Amino acid sequence: MLTALVYVAAALAEIAGCFSFWAWLRLGKSSLWLIPGTASLLLFAWLLTLIDVSAAGRAYAAYGGVYVTVSLLWLWAMEGVWPDRWDLGGATLCLIGAAIIILAPRPA
């Protein structure tokens, strides 16, 4: 359960950080948006180090499914765009892949 919470927190931190750059470069917002955005990206990187896995790449691969799902929630909640069936189908496939990576039996 803690792993899932860390992954969701990391996804929110990464998306918020990246969105600050999007807002600055694409929406014409002040460059001051980059200050909390950069802090958010640092938080994202730190949070992924809390995942209890033997290899960083495995943590990142499993995180990918969570990131896609949280990104679609951001799309809906923050940008007012409802994900279509292709978005939802793709997210489902990503979550299945992430679950396989996270839950696979591995030697200790």
From Swiss-Prot:
Which segments cross the bilayer?
5-25, 31-51, 62-82, 88-108
| Top-level taxon of origin | Bacteria
Keywords from the named record: Cell inner membrane, Cell membrane, Membrane, Transmembrane, Transmembrane helix
- Matches recorded under InterPro entries: UPF0060
Subcellular compartments: Cell inner membrane
Please name the Pfam families in this protein's record.
UPF0060
- Principal cellular location given in the protein's record: membrane
**Cell inner membrane among the record's keywords?**
yes
GO cellular component terms, semicolon-separated: plasma membrane
What kind of membrane protein is this, topologically?
Answer: Multi-pass membrane protein
UniProt keyword GTP-binding present: no
UniProt similarity note:
Belongs to the UPF0060 family.
What is this protein identified as? UPF0060 membrane protein Msil_1658
Native species: Methylocella silvestris (strain DSM 15510 / CIP 108128 / LMG 27833 / NCIMB 13906 / BL2)
